[in-house]
Amino acid sequence: MGFIQVSRGTRDILPDEVIYWQYVEATARQLLHQAAYRELRTPIFEQTNLFERGIGEATDVVGKEMYTFQDRGDRSITLRPEGTAGAVRSFIENKLHAQGGVQRLWYIGPMFRYERPGAGRQRQFHQIGVEALGSQDPRADAEVIAIASQLLKSLGVPDWTLSLNSLGTAEDRQKYREALVTYLSQYKDDLDPDSQDRLQRNPLRILDSKDPKTKEIAQSAPNILDYLGTDSKQHFDRVQQLLTDLDIAYKLNPCLVRGLDYYTHTAFEFELEGLGNQATVCGGGRYDRLVSELGGPETPAVGWAIGMERLILLLQNAEITLNQSLDFYCVARGPEAEAQALLICQNLRENGFSVEMDLSGSAFGKQLKRANRSGALACLILGDTEACDRTVQLKWLASGEQESIAQADLRNLTSQLQSKLTAAKGNSST
């Protein structure tokens, strides 16, 4: 029998790549803590009608891309295709709105969509998202955009562009929808098949088409900003002014509509250079009606989600180097030396050091070669002599400097070892 392969559209994330994921996760976690956002963890599957009602039945996500199945209780269940609907469901069900003020939440985890796999696009993908629920103030819009901008900067992401638009209120959007359909109907036969299908079902998505001919037609379409009511225009003007005050550059893009029906007012995307058609790494906006449409009280909200696969692909392409340094690699030969080495390694780990012990039982020469390849800063060496004397040889791998230390003293040299390891890390990075 042949071996079982990973399912199409999914992939293994191997240790050499995991360090990039850990880097992104740790950076985001620290930044979001500083911004007073609290982590929320929701199930990866929900009742299907949550997404049908929340995202919109006319969207491509609901119509074409969801993983939906009947469970053993004959209930329709869907693997979550995005994080906002589940976060809002949790906000309502657990009565977080009763706590008053703005609920600043964030989440991280896998999402699932049946899409054509490609670079930076998988059927199981991962997102970091934020949701600020309870404020219609334009400052909330500016805050979440500023956090996304700061995260990209903190990660060292080069060359990104912020695109900005407003979808106005539901009333503004309906007026614009009618004008857009009237305009696009003149060119129906020239639109690509997907856009022809969307003309009556979800015409705003035509503005986001990647088809060259359709894009050309969309460029001359009515501008949604011309259909904003007074309140919507004032809100959007204030968001723009706040971003200018924050020194966050942006460009207006009236064709930016996002793919989910729940958006109102501000919509935005961060696009990166070097990712081709998968350039959008972060997208979001305001969704003032979603909470009430899912059965909760009227609650204005704004948020975004970052696609981790695309972000990590960019970090790798930019050759941003991350080192997951190991403090010690331990080699030993002989039953007594190996037993003592096991105890030494455990004691060092309990004192906060990272230690890998060679378990091969091979000759010292082969073990030392593995130590040099391990990326460790220092090597601990125990043979018969060291086992008899209760000592250990400590070799600094970058310099070759070696010293003999009593095992009992090694346990009491935590601060000195830490200082030497810090110095060794500095030398190895230069």
Swiss-Prot record:
The keyword ATP-binding applies. InterPro entries: aa-tRNA-synth_II, aa-tRNA-synth_II/BPL/LPL, Anticodon-bd, Anticodon-bd_dom_sf, His-tRNA-ligase, HisRS-like_core, HisRS/HisZ, HisRS_anticodon. One of its GO terms (cellular component) is cytoplasm. Its main location: cytoplasm. It is found in: Cytoplasm. This is Histidine--tRNA ligase. Belongs to the class-II aminoacyl-tRNA synthetase family. The keyword Cell inner membrane does not apply. One of its GO terms (biological process) is histidyl-tRNA aminoacylation. Its EC number is 6.1.1.21. NCBIfam families: hisS (TIGR00442). Keywords: Aminoacyl-tRNA synthetase, ATP-binding, Cytoplasm, Ligase, Nucleotide-binding, Protein biosynthesis. It catalyses: tRNA(His) + L-histidine + ATP = L-histidyl-tRNA(His) + AMP + diphosphate + H(+). One of its GO terms (molecular function) is histidine-tRNA ligase activity. The gene is hisS. Homodimer. PANTHER family: HISTIDINE--TRNA LIGASE, MITOCHONDRIAL-RELATED (PTHR43707:SF1), HISTIDYL-TRNA SYNTHETASE (PTHR43707). It comes from Acaryochloris marina (strain MBIC 11017). Pfam families: HGTP_anticodon (PF03129), tRNA-synt_His (PF13393). Gene3D superfamilies: Anticodon-binding domain, Bira Bifunctional Protein, Domain 2.
